[in-house]
């Protein structure tokens, strides 16, 4: 028996998966309801959610953090689910962890650059 257990990187990915799942279950539906349904129906008074106000929010520090969380966390959750679904279906992608988590990392960097240049 090995007395020195090997360190695992899985808690990092499970943490991002859990955070993305919670974000996707609690925050994302509310934002989609506000922006995709209620805003076009005119449920908000006047310029409450005008383009200029939304752009100003998105260009503020808290708005940029919100956009990053809104995109990156569900992205990690989804790619983690796909990685484990492929494993459950006995479809073994060579270096699957590198493929799926690498793609999530690359897309996170692209999102970060995109949000910073907003």
UniProtKB/Swiss-Prot annotation:
Signal peptide: none annotated. One of its GO terms (molecular function) is succinate dehydrogenase activity. Coiled coil: none annotated. GO terms for cellular component: fumarate reductase complex; plasma membrane. GO terms for biological process: fumarate metabolic process. CDD domains: QFR_TypeD_subunitD. Keywords: Cell inner membrane, Cell membrane, Membrane, Transmembrane, Transmembrane helix. The chain crosses the membrane at residues 24-44, 54-74, 98-118. Belongs to the FrdD family. This is Fumarate reductase subunit D. It comes from Yersinia pestis. The gene is frdD.
């Amino acid at each position: 028996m090995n007395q020195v257990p090997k360190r695992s990187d899985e808690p990092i990915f499970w943490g991002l998966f859990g955070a993305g799942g919670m974000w996707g279950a609690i925050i994302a539906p509310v934002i989609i309801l506000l922006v995709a349904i209620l805003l076009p129906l005119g449920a908000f008074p006047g310029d409450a959610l005008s383009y200029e106000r939304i752009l100003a929010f998105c260009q503020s520090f808290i708005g940029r953090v919100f956009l990053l969380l809104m995109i990156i966390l569900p992205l990690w959750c989804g790619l983690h689910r796909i990685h484990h679904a492929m494993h459950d279906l006995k479809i073994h992608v060579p270096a699957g962890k590198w493929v799926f988590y690498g793609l999530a990392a690359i897309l996170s960097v692209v999102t970060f650059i995109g949000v910073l240049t907003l």
